[in-house]
């Protein structure tokens, strides 16, 4: 078989790349080792609950997200529709002491909040005049302590990074993990001053598509990947094994075993990988081991994700995006999302759906706990932290383990990015994509895919 462009991986990045290229008339083929398309995105429906076993939400942080939804609603016949969270979901909670407390959303609440010390509240007034950092590899924790103070690290930065990266603020490097924050200081000298100036910058109509709203799809995120996989049809091959890619003159040869055990070959002009870095040594054997080691130096946070549903909340109402738990509070969960407060149809009418996140880089051992042990944690948190009375118990508990859940953009990132660029220049037609670069969120994945497709059309 011959194709213009071969894409490895049928997750969000791979499907978005393939769909965009195919919609522009390019001949594409997608290879996927799993027996289903969608990658980590997987929506489940059970007993009145609609829950995710991978990503739960995204943010419309770039126009590409909005543009993709506009297209997919058309090609899916209305089956894929954007759903954004209500204003109530802007409320974010942080656990301190014995309860969840709202993260400040304005000057008044910032002054009154018990989350931060009085000293750090005064300290933040001087943030616009603090000296700009000089270490390009400064961690998020170091940067936040220097500009904001320890209590802001403990009760804002640390839980935020637990929620996004399941990571450690003292190892995540700011310019890779939070490049927008890094650029505020570097370009404007201050977070506060930079945010104010950015807000005043003129925006085009396309810029305004990036509303920053929390999003899903009506009925769940699988409707996004299903819309693209249905559009692509037999251009996706599932259940492949033993994939090897090798350069051959100005083209590429991919060999693999299909689900029936037959040996197959594809000849392509361009190859795009969208899989995790840990897969690359096997599928790109032509890259020297010393160079591949620099690409494959990426650490992933392990994660246990647990969907917890209750059919009748007995009047308890959580109108917020979710609650995050600082490391210093020594709880067994990193955070809890409230999907039924954000999106329609996620729980029965009188019920609620929660998503617990457990583990991360600081507590990788949680992945080894049995279902019984994790269920005990779920029930304890349900009563102690979510404040359900003892007579009310979860009606749904579904446990999902992810060994390689979230890439950690640590000090090794610079070497990895440089090596990826070097390999792409050395081997014409090779594109190494996926969440090993350019951001981990769904919006990052969509933008990377659209950018690659734009470059190849």
Language-model region placement:
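N-terminal Rossmann-like FAD-binding beta1-loop-alpha1 element of flavoenzymes
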Residues: 3-30
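Conserved Rossmann-like nucleotide-cofactor binding loop
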Residues: 13, 36, 278
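Glycine-rich FAD pyrophosphate-binding loop
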Residues: 22-46
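Dinucleotide-binding Rossmann-like beta1-alpha1 core, especially the glycine-rich loop
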Residues: 47-131
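Conserved flavin/dinucleotide-binding core of flavoenzymes
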Residues: 104-108, 318, 336-457
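Active-site/ligand-binding neighborhood in enzyme catalytic cores
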Residues: 126-245, 251
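Mid-domain catalytic core of redox enzymes
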Residues: 240-354, 361-367, 384-385
């Amino acid at each position: 078989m011959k194709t213009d462009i071969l894409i490895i991986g049928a997750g969000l990045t791979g499907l978005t790349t393939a769909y965009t290229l195919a919609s522009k008339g390019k001949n594409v083929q997608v290879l996927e080792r799993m027996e289903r398309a969608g990658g980590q995105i997987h929506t489940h429906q059970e007993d009145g609950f609609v829950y995710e076993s991978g990503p739960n939400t995204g943010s419309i942080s770039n126009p590409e997200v909005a543009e993709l939804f506009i297209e997919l609603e058309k090609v899916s016949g209305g089956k894929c529709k954007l759903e954004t969270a209500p204003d109530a979901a802007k409320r974010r909670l942080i656990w301190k002491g014995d309860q969840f407390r709202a993260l400040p959303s304005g000057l008044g609440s910032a002054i009154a909040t018990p989350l931060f010390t009085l000293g750090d509240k005064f300290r933040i007034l001087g943030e616009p005049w603090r000296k700009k950092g000089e270490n390009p590899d400064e961690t998020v924790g170091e940067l936040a302590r220097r500009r904001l103070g320890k209590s802001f690290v403990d009760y804002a930065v640390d839980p935020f990074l637990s929620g996004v990266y399941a990571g450690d603020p003292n190892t995540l490097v700011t310019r890779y993990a939070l490049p927008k924050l890094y650029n505020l200081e570097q370009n404007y000298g201050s977070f506060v001053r930079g945010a104010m100036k950015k807000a005043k910058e003129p925006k085009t109509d396309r810029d305004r598509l990036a509303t920053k709203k929390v999003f899903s799809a009506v009925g769940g995120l699988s409707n996004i990947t299903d819309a693209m996989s249905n559009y692509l049809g037999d251009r996706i091959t599932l259940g492949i094994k033993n994939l090897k890619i090798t350069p051959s003159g100005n083209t590429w040869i991919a060999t693999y075993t299909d689900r029936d055990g037959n040996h197959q070959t594809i000849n392509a002009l361009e190859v795009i990988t969208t899989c995790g870095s840990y897969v690359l040594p096997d599928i790109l054997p032509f890259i020297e081991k010393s160079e591949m080691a620099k690409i494959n130096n990426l650490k992933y946070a392990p994660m246990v994700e647990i969907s917890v549903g209750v059919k009748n909340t007995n009047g308890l109402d959580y109108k917020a995006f979710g609650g995050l738990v600082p490391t210093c509070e020594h709880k067994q969960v990193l955070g809890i999302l409230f999907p039924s407060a954000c999106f329609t149809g996620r729980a029965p009418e009188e019920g609620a759906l929660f998503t617990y996140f457990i583990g991360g880089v600081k507590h990788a051992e949680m992945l080894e706990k049995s279902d019984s042990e994790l269920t005990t944690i779920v029930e304890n948190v349900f009563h102690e932290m979510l404040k359900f009375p003892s007579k009310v118990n979860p009606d749904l508990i579904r446990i999902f383990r992810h060994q390689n859940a979230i890439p950690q953009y640590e000090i090794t990132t610079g070497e990895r990015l440089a090596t990826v660029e070097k390999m792409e220049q050395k081997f014409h037609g090779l594109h190494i994509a996926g969440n090993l670069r350019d951001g981990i969120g769904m919006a990052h994945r969509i933008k990377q895919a659209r950018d690659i497709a734009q470059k190849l059309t």
